[in-house]
């Protein structure tokens, strides 16, 4: 206990007096008895119910889940009413075959259908759902299935952002397909905030004993730990500790480690040298678990009973919660994201009061953007109501959906630098080209690379495959600086 208290390395003299060789042998004996034959995630079986077969043409031809997925796609495609033989018809059908082939080969068919099953239930019960967001918006098949309402072909969104052949992994063992859960595609399902519990209850009833929520562990950040240690260990005033903790910077949205801050920020170092008890205590406590919570949207879905793959806790409502965090739990189980959003509820209620269907709204109607110009208080307008986004909106003066989307993208910390450049483009048609090679890609955003899809297009333009471009996108998105430096060399070689 003294070793733990003093944060020291245990000395050989203080180790157990038991024979080390005997303990090693005992450990190896026990280790051999453990069943560590973990292959990955086995998807829960998707059952094609009679009700589902009534939705499609020629149900007698359905032999498996892949056939059923194709039939659902055909039904959705017919609604587009495209002229057969046209360029548009070919472009769309090519995309369907491309996506279907990848989903089948990677073993994702049943996962797609499981998500469709949840959305179908919501629609049958008149539970409002979102229009789709995130990487799932890049899948045209999800659009055909009604899981999203975003035509990824029309809006030039990449399927590789959703599913990458390089990133995804599967293996066959004794005729059973196992997937790498940490590398699976991810679909966010936004539902009415007030009716989310109905969706969770449906999942629990459909997959009895095979679902649970996911535990989250909140740790002590550098800012918090130095602030609290100063107040408790050396009785420092709140005002002083707010000033000191404010010296700890954020790098790419993450609080810098206090040890690194000590080495790089002179004022912080001077204060810590004068208050060594606070600093030494903070060093020991940083990164420790502060409290635990529950993930706001993630639900685990297991092939077997959930207790077979995860230790389970019960909360005050007797709901099951995985004691593993999300990274560990997804090694063995499918993760579904069902998020209750008040905005989905508000939009649905407003449309019902007015007597319109949200899908019938003309998103290019001039009155929408005129209202944005006249706004004095943006409260209640999703994302635009944030102070930064509202200021960007007033400067850019968006005239259509494309420009409004750019406003929200410009509101992020890394993109704020380019607000004036983009505003010059939208207001005065001033375009600042980066390189002739990328003009076609960046023209719509005034020479500013606002979207991750643009990064992928640029990488593809100089010779990388779209799957390779997706790897680059993830590295940049997750701010892996060392990996980015490696990619610089690859890019130079291509150029």
Question: Can you say where each PLM-predicted feature lies in the sequence?
Answer:
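Alpha-helical scaffold/interaction cores of sigma-54-like transcription cofactors
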Residues: 1-9, 14, 19-495
């Amino acid at each position: 206990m003294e070793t733990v208290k003093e944060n020291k390395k245990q000395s050989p003299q203080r180790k157990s007096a038991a024979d080390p060789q005997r303990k090693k042998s005992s450990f190896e004996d026990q280790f051999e008895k453990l069943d560590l034959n973990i292959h990955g995630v086995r998807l829960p079986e998707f059952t094609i119910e009679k009700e589902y077969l009534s939705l499609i043409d020629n149900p007698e031809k359905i032999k498996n889940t892949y056939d059923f997925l194709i039939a659902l796609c055909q039904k959705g495609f017919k609604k587009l009413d495209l002229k057969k033989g046209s360029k548009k018809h070919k472009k769309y059908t090519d995309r369907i075959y491309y996506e279907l082939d990848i989903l089948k080969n990677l073993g994702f068919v049943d996962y797609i259908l499981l998500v469709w099953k949840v959305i179908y239930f919501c629609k049958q019960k008149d539970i409002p759902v979102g229009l789709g967001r995130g990487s799932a918006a890049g899948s045209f098949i999800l659009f055909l299935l009604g899981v999203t309402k975003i035509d990824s072909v029309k809006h030039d969104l990449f399927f590789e952002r959703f599913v990458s052949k390089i990133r995804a992994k599967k293996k066959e063992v004794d005729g059973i397909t196992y997937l790498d859960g940490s590398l699976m595609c991810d679909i966010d399902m936004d539902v009415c905030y007030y009716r989310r519990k109905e969706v969770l209850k449906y999942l629990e009833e459909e997959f009895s004993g095979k679902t649970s929520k996911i535990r989250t562990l909140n740790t002590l950040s550098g800012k918090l730990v130095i602030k609290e240690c100063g107040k408790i260990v050396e009785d420092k005033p709140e005002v002083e500790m707010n000033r000191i903790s404010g010296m700890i910077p954020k790098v790419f949205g993450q609080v810098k480690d206090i040890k690194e801050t000590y080495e790089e920020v002179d004022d912080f170092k001077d204060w810590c040298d004068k208050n060594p008890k606070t600093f030494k205590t903070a060093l020991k406590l940083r990164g420790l678990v502060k409290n635990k919570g529950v993930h706001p949207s993630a639900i685990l879905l297991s092939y077997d009973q959930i207790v077979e793959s995860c230790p389970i806790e019960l909360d005050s409502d007797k709901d099951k919660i995985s004691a593993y965090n999300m990274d560990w739990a997804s090694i063995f189980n499918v993760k579904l994201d069902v998020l209750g959003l008040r905005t989905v509820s508000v939009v649905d209620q407003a449309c019902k009061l007015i007597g319109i269907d949200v899908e019938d709204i003309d998103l290019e109607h001039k009155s929408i953007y005129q209202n944005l110009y006249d706004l004095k208080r943006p409260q209640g307008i999703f994302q635009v109501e944030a102070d930064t986004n509202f200021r960007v909106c007033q400067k850019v003066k968006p005239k259509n959906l494309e420009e409004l989307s750019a406003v929200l993208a410009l509101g992020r910390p890394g993109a704020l630098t380019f607000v004036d450049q983009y505003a010059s483009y939208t207001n005065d048609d001033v375009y600042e080209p980066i390189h002739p090679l990328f003009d076609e890609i960046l023209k719509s955003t005034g020479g500013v690379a606002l979207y991750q899809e643009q990064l992928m297009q640029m990488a593809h333009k100089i010779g990388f495959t779209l799957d390779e471009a997706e790897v680059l996108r993830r590295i940049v998105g997750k701010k892996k600086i060392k990996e980015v430096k490696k990619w610089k060399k690859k890019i130079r070689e291509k150029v």
